[in-house]
Amino acid sequence: MVELNDVPGEEEFPRATYLETMVRLLDTVSYNDENFTDEERVECLKYAYGKAAEHFAQPHVQETLKVPPKRMAAALKTIVGMCVYSWCRVSKEVMADLSIHYTYTLLLDDSREEPAGTMATWYEDLLNARPQAHGWWRLVNDFIPNVLRHYGGYCQMNMVRSTIDFFQGCWIEQHNFKGFRGSSDYPGFLRRINGLGHCVGSSIWPIELVDEEEHFLEITTAIAQMENWMVWTNDLFSFYKEYFAERDQTSLVNNYVECEGITLDQALDKLCKDTIRSSEEIIQVFHDKDPKMYEILTRFIQGYITWHLCDDRYRLVEVYEAAGDDPVAQKFKKYAESARRVGAIDPARYCVPSVTELCEREMAKQSAGRSWDFGLGKIANKISSVAQ
């Protein structure tokens, strides 16, 4: 495994530039999340979390993933929030299945496991319907039909292909490679394959909402636009937490710096301009298309931003608390407060029972089963001895 890079210090963080870039994006999309009432949001969170927690508490899933309960709980809470807040017009069943699929991707993204030793027969095993050598692929292949059933064939193919791309992107990240100087195509290449943009862009359109053939051209365009918008927005809002995370030093912004020889402020500005341009294009392209599709996209944008501003993973409350009193900082604070009014939901309202509790119950069942089997074995031995 390649050594991870040093993490920069707090004093080096470009706080003023970062606040300005976030505010510029929030202004561009006219951020104001009205996707749910409080009761609706909690109801959807509770349903999706419950279904996903049951899935990940299964003994064979736990044994294969070997993820500590605390990390599993954090990952599940994060992804359920993303799927509910962003996919606000789909059924609760779709939210739940997407929550499970994207939790698998988050767990892989946070993993440090080197996959090379288990991937030599990946395609051969897939072609011959043999179990994959890599445990993550065994679980994902087993579950993904539950997700795909909600979509038409075109979106299904995009989602599967994008998931494969994502795995390869995580594989590259295991090498902590920011790219060679002068390779200006590398940062975008890596971000496209590890961003799940096509999977997300396709999964916005389940057949319960949209006829795939009727809206084929709009769906294709939306996938093309969301490929960049979704990952660039994520890069912008996750920049703070990734800046201080040892595992996340191969971020898009850092890769721009390494490959193009520009400063961190210049790289942030580049990301901001690209994200704003993408946001403007989505609005301009779809505002005169089918009203339902425009509404789905704009509500996705609002919810996706709310999720980032509220989820503990992104630590943006720290940025909020450290923001000063200048006009840009004050504007960011107002946006953050607006997001938290609708999106900062106490986990006790929906993480019940928690995935940790469900895992403990399953372990207790297994332990009781082993004790029962052992007791029966002792009785059988005694009977056998008496019979002799």
Swiss-Prot record:
Disruption phenotype: Impairs the production of harzianum A and leads to the production of a larger quantity of the aspinolides B and C. Its EC number is 4.2.3.6. This is Trichodiene synthase. Some of the cofactor binding sites show unusual localization within the protein. Trichodiene synthase; part of the gene cluster that mediates the production of the antimicrobial trichothecene harzianum A (HA) that plays a role in Botrytis cinerea antagonistic activity and plant defense priming. The biosynthesis of harzianum A begins with the cyclization of farnesyl diphosphate to trichodiene and is catalyzed by the trichodiene synthase TRI5. Trichodiene undergoes a series of oxygenations catalyzed by the cytochrome P450 monooxygenase TRI4. The gene is TRI5. Its cofactor is Mg(2+); Mn(2+). GO terms for molecular function: metal ion binding; trichodiene synthase activity.
